[in-house]
Amino acid sequence: MQTLKYHRIMLKLGGESLSAAGGSGIDAVQAKDIARRIKEVRELGVDVAIVIGAGNLWRGRVGQEMGMDQATADYMGMLGTVMNALALMDALEHQGVMTRVMTSIEMKTVAEPYIWRRAIHHMEKGRVV
């Protein structure tokens, strides 16, 4: 049996990783492939936390070009990250991987509030956060 160098990892995924090559939006094939790879890591006994971007859905420079208030553009990006997290959550759970989506923006019906200790607890229970 191999010895793991890390027992807990944080994976940073750009939003574009959920898009088909050269595209935008969320591609089901890409989401399933990423979920399969994450499942393989979990099966090694590694705790996994994921931070996902939203570049496939929203780019801040578009907001700048529109003359949008920076805070509004930032909020749009944060909403995009939750959308991507929900898509990845669904792909993971279809493969039998328990997950929790957490966010610092309050939206109780779709994601838990991010609390560091709660995130650690979820990972200790075998969930991908």
Predicted regions and their residues:
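N-terminal glycine-/serine-/threonine-rich phosphate-binding loop
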Residues: 1-47
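Solvent-exposed alpha-helices and their adjacent loops that cap or buttress functional pockets
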Residues: 1-5, 40-44, 49-50, 94, ...
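General beta-strand structural signal in soluble alpha/beta enzymes
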Residues: 11, 49-53, 99-103
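Short, active-site-adjacent cap segments at secondary-structure transitions
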Residues: 17-19, 55-60, 108-109
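N-terminal active-site beta-alpha-beta segment that forms phosphate/nucleotide-binding
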Residues: 32, 40-41, 47-48, 54-61, ...
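Extended interaction regions within the primary functional domain
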Residues: 33-34, 50, 107, 122
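Ligand-binding beta-strand-loop-alpha-helix segment within the catalytic cores
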Residues: 63-129
